[in-house]
């Protein structure tokens, strides 16, 4: 938001100092004719009345308690105390072949989560988002996309790809006993995935359909489009999108190359699991 942390945490205290007249003065000064109005007209909402069926009243004895409920209510429960992360001591830092590693031990269970973080979001290149959406539908020379999911299911693991405004994240998680096998499977997939024209066509259709629906969605218009416009003006992360024509004309080789370029770039590895 472009403000110092010390200012941010004092925001509530500063707001408590304001009175009614301060609000009135602010509104009179800034809320004039410099506003935008959005009208949305989408047909006529015709509501058909449905006859309500007769409902048989149910007699409920709210005073009656089972033995199980009594035993449950009699148990003493300790208050839950929050546990805060100590960034100095809880998170460890190291390197794997010059790749920065951030790791934290999981004391709760025998599950792990491993994430590769690349500073290559849509602000760097908007094609990256489509490329990594495409990647999740692909297989390799030896397995199909469906077989990929079956293998992960047998390992008790999950694999996901996410591209935000700032970062690309490649993530795997699952049972610690299958950690090595899951990592090897991920590395093999990222080195040997192959294009699928049918999957690409379906992805294009899905993206264009979501765009069309978003134009009619009040939540998207207000909390995404308008908020971004208020923060950044005409050029914002929300408007940093590929045209429909570009999407229709993009080729598999373009997306495959984007994934490989990102995967070969500088990144950070983050691990959370039971291993030291």
What are these regions (language model features)?
Residues 1-74, 150-276:
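Charge-rich, well-structured scaffold segments of protease-associated domains
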Residues 2, 78-82, 90-91, 145-148, ...:
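Intrinsically disordered, low-complexity segments enriched in polar/charged residues with Gly/Pro
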Residues 41-44, 98-100, 106-108, 117-121, ...:
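Solvent-exposed coil/turn segments that connect beta secondary-structure elements
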Residues 77-110:
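N- or domain-start disorder-to-order transition segments that initiate the globular core
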Residues 94, 114-116, 172:
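Preference for bulky hydrophobic residues occupying beta-strand positions
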Residues 107-152:
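Active/ligand-binding-proximal structured segments within catalytic/core domains
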């Amino acid at each position: 938001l472009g403000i110092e942390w010390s200012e941010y945490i004092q925001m509530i205290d500063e707001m408590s100092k304001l009175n009614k007249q301060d609000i009135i003065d602010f509104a009179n000064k800034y809320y004039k004719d410099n506003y935008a109005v959005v009208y949305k007209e989408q047909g006529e909402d015709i509501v058909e009345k449905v006859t309500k069926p007769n409902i048989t009243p149910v007699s409920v004895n709210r005073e009656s308690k089972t033995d199980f409920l009594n035993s449950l209510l009699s148990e003493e429960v300790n208050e839950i105390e929050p546990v805060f992360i100590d960034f100095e001591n809880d998170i460890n830092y190291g390197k794997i072949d010059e790749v920065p590693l951030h790791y934290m031990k999981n004391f709760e269970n025998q599950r792990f989560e491993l994430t590769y973080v690349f500073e290559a979001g849509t602000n760097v290149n908007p094609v990256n988002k489509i490329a990594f959406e495409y990647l999740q539908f692909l297989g390799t020379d030896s397995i199909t996309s469906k077989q990929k999911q079956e293998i992960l299911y047998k390992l008790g693991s999950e694999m996901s790809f996410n591209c935000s405004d700032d970062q690309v994240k490649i993530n795997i998680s699952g049972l610690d006993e299958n950690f090595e096998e899951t990592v090897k499977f991920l590395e093999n997939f990222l080195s040997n995935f192959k294009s699928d024209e049918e999957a690409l066509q379906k992805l294009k259709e899905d993206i264009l359909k979501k765009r069309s629906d978003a134009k009619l969605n009040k939540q998207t218009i207000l909390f995404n489009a308008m908020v971004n416009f208020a923060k950044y003006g005409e050029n914002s992360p929300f408007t940093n999108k590929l045209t429909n024509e570009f999407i229709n004309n993009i080729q598999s080789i373009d997306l495959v190359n984007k994934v490989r370029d990102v995967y070969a770039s500088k990144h950070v590895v983050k691990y959370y699991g039971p291993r030291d």
